[in-house]
Regions:
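Serine-esterase "nucleophile elbow" of acetyl-processing enzymes
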Residues: 2-67, 72-73, 79-91, 96
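Alpha-helical cap/lid subdomain in secreted, periplasmic
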Residues: 14, 57, 76-239
Length: 239
């Protein structure tokens, strides 16, 4: 395998106003895919369209979200996805946005069942994924959305809960911090806004954001400092 330098957040300083449009890939689970938003396609799709507008930064954004993916599955396809997004002059992507982990945290068949991915194994897998991604290009990580516990189990099998979500997102946040990878803590932000605010932004399954939820998520993402520098238009308005 070709050896690459490790990229830290310090190498994310070039803004789109200072360089040519970037090629960006977003990899992860249904939160990246946009499941639950039949109107606008989720936050990644809306960001992709915004960057295509005449006065925008012109970045190319590939949505590589797969429903149900866990950390190991994202890691397995990461480099292949990265290599196959070459365009002019075989250029590879300039930035990776990761968002994964909630499917690892779910408990199987009952409230006290085993996690889909054992926590110790998850810590190892998320560290490996981040290391792998950093060998390719700079990385940003968008954290998971808190579920509606009252709607569980999902598909009569998966018991998602806040306690496990917190453990898994904290492991991810710490691993990102250790590698100087910017981490957007959506879980803590949304929990702080209260049950009423949060539940209005989830679909009936209690797991996926709805159209309003993805709008809120997009606003959190575009105002996040590590990504905000990539915008040339500060006046973003969702239509």
């Amino acid at each position: 395998m070709r050896t690459f330098p490790t990229y830290s957040s310090m190498q994310l300083s070039l803004s789109p106003t200072q360089c040519q449009p970037l090629k960006i890939i977003a990899l992860g689970d249904s939160l990246v895919y946009g499941f639950g938003d039949p109107e606008k396609g989720g936050w990644v799709e809306q960001l992709r369209r915004w960057w295509m507008l005449p006065d925008s930064s012109g970045h190319v954004l590939y949505n590589l979200g797969v429903r149900g993916d866990r950390t190991q599955q994202v890691a397995q396809r990461l480099e292949v996805e990265f290599r196959h997004r070459g365009e002019l002059r075989n250029r590879v992507p300039d930035l990776i946005i990761l968002s994964v982990g909630v499917n690892d945290s779910a408990r199987l068949t009952r409230l006290n069942g085993r996690n889909c991915t054992d926590f110790a194994l998850f810590e190892s897998e998320i560290a490996s994924l981040l290391d792998q991604a950093q060998q390719l290009c700079p990385v940003l990580f968008v954290g998971m959305v808190p579920v509606d516990e009252a709607k569980m189990p999902f598909l009569n099998c998966f018991y998602f809960n806040h306690a496990d979500q917190y453990r898994y997102k904290e492991a991810t946040r710490i691993a990102c911090n250790q590698r100087q990878i910017p981490y957007l803590d959506i879980f803590d932000q949304w929990m702080a806004r209260g049950d009423t605010w949060r539940n209005k932004r989830l679909t009936e399954d209690g797991l996926h954001p709805n159209t309003l939820g993805y709008q809120s998520l997009l606003e959190d993402v575009i105002h996040w400092e590590p990504l905000a520098g990539y915008h040339t238009r500060p006046d973003y308005q969702l239509k």
